[in-house]
């Protein structure tokens, strides 16, 4: 059995397309946070893997939103990707890491809150069948 590193896995584009923009950015947030934490801890292997996964999620998000009526979302996704990559490759990590992490963390909180609200709504529907 061949063991693959986690960075060899790619997001399922069909399943990814079913998610909302906020869910996309919330999931990207997790990889951004992992990359920043790994960088701060000096773990280059984990940092590289998290960056690789984040790039894959950014690419999948661009694929979803390009050519749609909501393609205005692309500007934000592409700008966020550029800022994330600049953080690791332009030598500005110390100055910008907290701001970039904070930006993405807001999406993570929003995505989690929306998921929680959907779960509560489903519980209400199942608790009161036949009522809206």
Where are these regions (language model features)?
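Surface-exposed peri-terminal alpha-helical interaction modules
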Residues: 1-132
């Amino acid at each position: 059995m061949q063991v693959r590193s986690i960075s060899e896995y790619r997001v399922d584009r069909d399943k990814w397309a079913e998610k909302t923009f906020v869910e996309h950015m919330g999931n990207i947030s997790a990889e951004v946070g992992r990359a920043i934490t790994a960088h701060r801890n000096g773990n280059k292997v984990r940092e590289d893997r998290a960056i690789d996964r984040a790039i894959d999620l950014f690419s999948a998000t661009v694929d979803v939103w390009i050519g749609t009526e909501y393609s205005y979302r692309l500007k934000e996704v592409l700008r966020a990707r550029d800022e994330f990559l600049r953080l690791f490759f332009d030598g500005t990590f110390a100055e910008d890491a907290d701001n970039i992490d904070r930006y993405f963390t807001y999406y993570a909180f929003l995505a989690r809150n929306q998921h929680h609200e959907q779960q509560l709504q489903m519980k209400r529907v199942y608790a009161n069948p036949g009522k809206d």
